[in-house]
């Protein structure tokens, strides 16, 4: 049996809920992470809102004095250590969360950097996404996230997205 114990996957939960335990996105991310874990992949799920992250396409928002704390450089190191990056987002008004956009902007700040071989930093890494919500837009959100990841250098495999969508409007969410 093939195992993938030489791979590391980072799942970024871009829920707009501060409490990770209340996040429906986290619950679906956990299912995807469980599949990878069962195949030997080293898996980590990070709840983005548990960290202080400055805005803008900057590597460290403390360098210009606009913020006294920015946890992004540490998150970026975790991204760089991962072979696989999965961005999880809820759908709000048919769009990905503002937290997922913040993650993409911060990653983009590194997109011009090169590794020791002269390749873009994200070269050779794979990305995917998980989308949850009670309204239409899974494919549109996935398209935006996956295009951004491809644009900065990630490889996007076939069927790189999954999602759960309930009936439009108020009602049960994924974890209910």
Language-model-detected regions and their locations in the chain:
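Alpha-helix boundary/capping detector
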Residues: 35, 62, 105-106, 112, ...
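N-terminal beta1-alpha1-beta2 submodule of the flavodoxin-like/Rossmannoid cofactor-binding fold
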Residues: 1-117
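Short, surface-exposed, charge-dense and proline/glycine-enriched linear segments
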Residues: 71-82, 119-122, 144-153, 170-175
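A general structural signal for short secondary-structure boundary/capping elements
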Residues: 57, 92-93, 136, 173-176
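C-terminal and late-domain segments of enzyme folds
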Residues: 1-3, 155-176
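Short, glycine-/small-residue-rich phosphate/pyrophosphate-handling segment
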Residues: 116-166
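Active-site oxyanion-binding pockets that recognize sulfate/phosphate
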Residues: 18-22, 131, 176
């Amino acid at each position: 049996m093939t195992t993938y114990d030489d791979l590391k996957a980072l799942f970024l939960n871009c829920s707009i809920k501060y409490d990770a335990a209340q996040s429906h996105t986290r619950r679906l991310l956990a299912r995807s992470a469980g599949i990878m874990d069962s195949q030997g992949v080293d898996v980590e799920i990070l709840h983005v809102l548990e960290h202080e992250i400055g805005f803008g396409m900057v590597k460290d928002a403390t360098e210009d004095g606009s913020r006294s704390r920015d946890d992004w450089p540490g998150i970026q190191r975790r991204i760089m250590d991962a072979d696989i990056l999965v961005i999880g987002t809820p759908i709000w008004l048919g769009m990905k969360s503002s937290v997922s956009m913040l993650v993409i902007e911060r990653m983009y700040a590194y997109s011009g950097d090169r590794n020791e071989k002269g390749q873009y930093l994200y070269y050779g890494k794979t990305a995917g996404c998980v989308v949850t919500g009670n309204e239409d837009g899974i494919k549109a959100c996935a398209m935006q996230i996956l295009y951004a990841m491809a644009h900065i250098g990630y490889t996007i495999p076939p069927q790189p997205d999954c999602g759960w969508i309930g009936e439009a409007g108020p009602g049960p969410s994924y974890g209910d």
